[in-house]
Design a protein with these regions (language model features):
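…; additionally, a secondary subgroup of soluble metalloenzymes is captured
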Residues: 1-406, 413-566, 570-606
Length: 606
């Protein structure tokens, strides 16, 4: 076998059995390339999670076609062991070919519970390492260390200096490596044994990305002050002089050759913020310039040129993981913010590079979407990958994390670049706010009735075909989802039309002792967008002005005061575009909005 997927894909030969039932306790068939391989072989895949939802799709999309004599190959996936296949409905169990796959069969010499914690995207590297090194039967700790070394390229015994540790943590957090907690705990345990990092908050900065960036943010000004005073690297430790929120050594070797490249990138993408410095001219011609606060248009243009260059060399490939696009999107959004800043003079070369890059990204993303998007719907909801996963993700938090209350704020029409502006303004108003960013894919087409309803229903749009032109059923979908999770109707709140005005009515609603789950729609950004005539720069200006007003901060503070954990998302974004006027099409289009037309068939669309 050349890779682990061959163990699975060799079992799928089209036109043999129209129904294949698979016991898949480890979710192997839901891995991106497995899904792609199954689809390329002509199979459709359907997970058996909810009896009613499954029966609806099965009867409408497959059973009815089979009854007409049509040939379609269907794979039904049960997320449990082979012994549970008998729990499937009678017609499925007796009509389908039965298969079973699990990680233990693919990695027989490694600890099954440890391997099961690993993100399926890392199984390629692990499979290659298993073939190359042929380990004997490894126990739990030995398996953890094998994975750390050969999958994540972390050799704990070689981490002896601060620069060694920082290199590992920067790669972990900046590249978005998904190391399971059990492996992180083992790494910390081994580092503690070495006694090299007794004063480092390893548990905090290893497990929490935002805490790690906060750790670096506090120490960057200290580094700059030493560099301007001494012109050399820091050797002494003067942590007692500084009041640091994240405990640990005050002096960090940002200028180490293994660290510097990461530091430049995280400043370029806005993950760290430049620091104020009195004698900043000393650093003007050094690499540290990128992390020094200045309001000069020249410095912003310098940052933009470097960011565009970085993005141009890192556009995800055709076979990229969805997480690669998430990572790319953060830098892309930062580029949009800077390039739309009225103070920045776009040199002709940089402007042309941005235009070329936009064309390159549009083509690459479109190609990737055509190839991979259809499989995203089947991925597990934790971590969420698509908008309809969010509601199930919240439910997991309520059940597993002992969170008593959650509030989901859906900012209609908010794009990622505009979120960066809102986040910046909120951080200026409340320095103790703690943000943890992640991304999900919206639904295509990303209209509000389709994408936003998927959030509140917790289901793909196929389950609400009669309401994809309206959002009127959102309150019902939201209440129904939580009722199905075992919550009482009085515990669930849905309010839309937020964004300005008084919060008194909402405050009274959320003050009810039963209120535990709040779905709140903020439509202010969408209203700004629909009235905008000044492009991206105008959007950024008005979104910033709105964020500077007290409304959003007051809403967040009110929710926090009432014990809510806050999750903020968007149903879709927006981009600047040139319109084509208002086509006079009569009743040809089913939906004739100002920015979208929906047609009943391909012929009329053409």
């Amino acid at each position: 076998m050349t890779n682990w997927r061959d163990h699975i894909l060799k079992e799928f030969t089209p036109r043999v059995e129209r129904l294949t039932v698979v016991a898949d306790p480890d979710g192997l068939l839901l891995e991106e390339k497995i899904l792609e391989g199954i689809r390329d072989r002509g199979f459709e895949l359907l997970t058996f999670d909810d009896h009613i939802e499954f029966r609806y799709v099965y009867e409408s999309r497959f059973r009815s076609h089979w009854d007409r004599g049509d040939q379609t190959d269907l794979v039904v996936v049960l997320r449990s062991g082979a012994d549970d296949l008998a729990s499937l409905p009678y017609d499925l169990f007796h009509a389908g070919r039965k298969l079973s796959f699990n990680l233990g069969d693919i990695f027989p010499n490694l600890s099954y519970p440890v391997v099961a914690t690993l993100n399926r995207g890392y199984l390629d590297v692990l499979y290659d390492a298993q073939k190359r090194h042929s380990p004997g039967n490894l126990g739990e700790n030995a398996t953890k260390e094998f994975i750390l070394r050969h999958v994540f390229e972390i050799a704990p015994e070689l981490i002896k200096q601060p620069s060694d540790l920082l290199r590992v943590l920067l790669r972990l957090h900046y590249q978005g490596q998904q190391i399971p907690d059990v492996l992180t705990a083992r790494l910390i345990q081994l580092l503690r044994k070495s006694n090299h990092f007794d004063d480092w908050p390893l548990e905090t900065i290893t497990l929490d990305r935002e805490a790690f960036y906060g750790f670096l943010q506090e120490r960057w000004p200290i580094f700059l002050s030493h560099m301007t005073a001494q012109g050399a690297s820091i050797a002494e430790d003067d942590r007692g002089v500084y009041n640091l929120a994240v405990k640990g050594p005050a002096n960090i070797p940002f200028d180490h050759h293994d660290i510097r490249g990461y530091v430049e990138s995280i400043f370029l993408e806005g993950l760290l913020q430049p620091a104020s410095l009195e004698n900043k001219d000393v650093l003007y011609k050094t690499w540290m310039r990128i992390g020094v606060k200045t309001h000069t248009a020249e410095n912003k243009s310098f940052k933009l040129a470097k960011l565009v260059s970085n993005l141009d060399s890192s556009v995800p490939k055709d076979d990229a993981k969805y997480t690669d696009w998430f990572h790319f999107a953060r830098g892309w959004a930062e580029m949009i913010v800077i390039s739309s800043d009225g103070e920045v003079h776009l040199h002709e070369e940089v402007n042309n590079n941005i235009k070329n890059l936009k064309g390159l990204v549009d083509a690459a993303f479109t190609k990737w979407i055509v190839k991979r998007y259809a499989g995203l719907i089947n991925l597990p909801p934790v971590p969420p990958v698509m908008l309809h996963h969010l509601t199930r993700y919240l439910a997991r938090h309520l059940v597993n994390d002992s969170i008593s209350k959650v509030a989901l704020l859906v900012v209609d029409g908010l794009s990622l670049d505009q979120w960066l502006i809102i986040r910046e303004e909120l951080a200026l108003q409340k320095t103790d706010y703690y943000f943890h960013d992640s991304m999900v894919f919206g639904w295509v087409p990303s209209t509000t009735p389709i994408s936003r309803q998927a959030i509140f229903a917790g289901k793909p749009p196929i389950f609400f075909p009669d309401s994809i032109y309206s959002t009127d059923k959102e309150p019902m979908f939201w209440a129904q989802f939580w009722t199905d999770q075992g919550f009482m109707p009085g515990e669930v709140v849905y309010v839309k039309g937020l964004g300005d005005g008084s919060l008194d009515d909402l405050s009274e609603t959320l003050s009810h002792p039963q209120a535990r789950i709040a779905g709140l729609v903020i439509d202010k950004v969408d209203k700004i967008m629909h009235g905008m005539e000044l492009g991206t720069a105008g959007m950024h200006n008005q979104v910033r002005q709105w964020a500077q007003q007290p409304y959003l901060r007051s809403l967040i503070e009110m929710l926090l005061d009432r014990g809510f954990h806050i999750f903020l998302t968007s149903d879709h974004g927006n981009i600047e575009a040139e319109g084509c006027g208002r086509p006079a099409e009569g009743v040809v289009a089913d939906l004739r909005g100002e920015r979208v037309r929906i047609y009943p068939n391909v012929s009329l669309r053409a």
